[in-house]
Amino acid sequence: MIEGFCTNTGKDVFIHALCNSVGGYVHQNDIQNIGQFEQGNWPHLDWNKWTDKPCVVVGTLRGTERIIWECQKRNHPFYYMDHAYFGATRYYKSKGPNGVLYRLIRSQMQLNYIVELEKEDYQRIKKFGKQEWKPFHKNGEHILLCPPTKAICRLYNLGDEQLWIDTQLTELQKYTDRNIIVRKKDTKVSLQKHLENCHAVVTHQSTAAIEAILAGVPSFCDNVSAANEVSESLYENIETPYYPDDDLIKQWVDSLLSVQFTGDEFKDGTAYHTATRLQT
């Protein structure tokens, strides 16, 4: 039914859980201790013959990006897993109130559209609690630019991080003279601190855009972003950002909640069947 691809990291627990839940096949990797930007190897995968089953990967490192690219080239379905949008648990073992949480996205890396939830979906996401967001403040001063990581630059063929930064700065400065703060992932300043007195956040597909919207800061992003439905994309509008209303934000938040699942939901088939139903 599906074929999962392991990378010999803690992430593999999600590959096994999802595949086992529907009788899928797990491709073991015959290379140990694969570096983040090195290639693993799945000896039972024939890259030429490929497969007629949807593929399953976690993240974009250790060769999983090759699976994603091949699926995209062939217009072949795949399932992508990564950190949850809300209440994310890190390092695959840490547990929050609902245990380990991960998201499951079909044939892309982010959920960039609003899905139509059914009664059972609203019931399931209640356990994540009510998500709060602040009203948009419209008197911010600086612009916060959040560049993609090296892995994301590679995945989307964006060049390197500095090239992306330079390109966005050049474009933004055509339309604004505001101070632009570049926030790299390794910064010691918290995102919430950077969002204080912020006019707008600019990202490619970083989940920082989600936190920005919830903090009352408008977002500019690429259409592959999970914040796509509540954001602007044209820099010419940087001085007049888009402010989505509460009804749209609620639909958007519920959509993101609907694609994240607990460890048990990955094991019992809920994750696979729900993601397939909502995202097909």
Predicted segments with their positions:
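N-terminal pre-catalytic "stem/leader" segment of glycosyltransferase-like enzymes
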Residues: M1-C55, A151-I152, Y272-T280
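Short, solvent-exposed loop/turn segments at secondary-structure junctions
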Residues: T9-K11, T60-G63, A84-G87, P148-I152, ...
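Well-ordered, non-membrane alpha-helical segments in soluble/globular domains
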Residues: K11-V22, T64-E65, G159-L172
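Extended catalytic core of nucleotide-activated donor transferases of GT-like folds
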Residues: D30, G35-K93
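Donor nucleotide-activated moiety binding/catalytic core segment of transferases
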Residues: G40-K49, T170-Q173, R178-A227
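Structural motif
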Residues: K53-P54, H142, H199-A200
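Leloir-type glycosyltransferase catalytic cores
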Residues: Y92-G140, Y175, E229-T280
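Conserved catalytic-core segment of nucleotide-activated headgroup transferases in glycan assembly
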Residues: W133, K138-D186
